């Protein structure tokens, strides 16, 4: 995709120093030619040389889409991959070790509902059919008022929509994660409405920013970050970006999402970022950056308003606050 006008999130001059360091590692991996070494080391832990080598064999790092840049440093990898929400494995942030129980190969994905032909295929085949991998730099804003900036690898969600060939009456895309209490202790907690479900309008799903991520930091997605395939919607609060997706259902009814079922007054369907609409229990005016701990002012739509604000024009003329929780 070629964008002549510099997007609102792009830096005016050069990229952040940490991004240069990251790019140097990417180029070194390419030059080293790991793909011919026949390494079979499993991906373990949260980083390291062995993981990077295996990633190179599996097609990572993906080519960078330079239309998507950052206005801040990339978050250190260890912070982004060890401070995570994944309620299937517990409510603490330090669940990355527990999440390694998730088996992501093989991983079957179903596309059903209001489509021309329902299909079931493995995640790798799905991504292949949806187009080649690319890498994008996105900001990520959690509803809990922390944030990170990371390089995601994956494909535009619009490509999956095109592949699915939804019927004219389809208005929404519902996404569902795995259900396996034998490995995910959080799913044994019956007061949660498992499995985790999220949804978008088709207009949102086909927006240029909506992304299906399969990797991060130039490597396949770690389990704790939502392997093998997750949603990334950078203009929305992070709970909208459902992890470890097993089903895409096209429907004419607005999905009732996981957190909306639990407390729709605090975690609604739209969940767009807005610093001037507080959470009922805390302010959203600022965000704490993982890694540096620095507090910065939150931006409307997380800084992506130029690309997405038009999706919501006139939707709630009497109370647009519904769009921001």
Language model features with spans:
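Structured, non-membrane catalytic/scaffold regions adjacent to prosthetic-group chemistry
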Residues: 54-325
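Serine/threonine-rich low-complexity intrinsically disordered regions
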Residues: 6-8, 12, 44-50, 110, ...
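N-terminal secretory signal peptides
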Residues: 1-27, 36, 41-43, 51
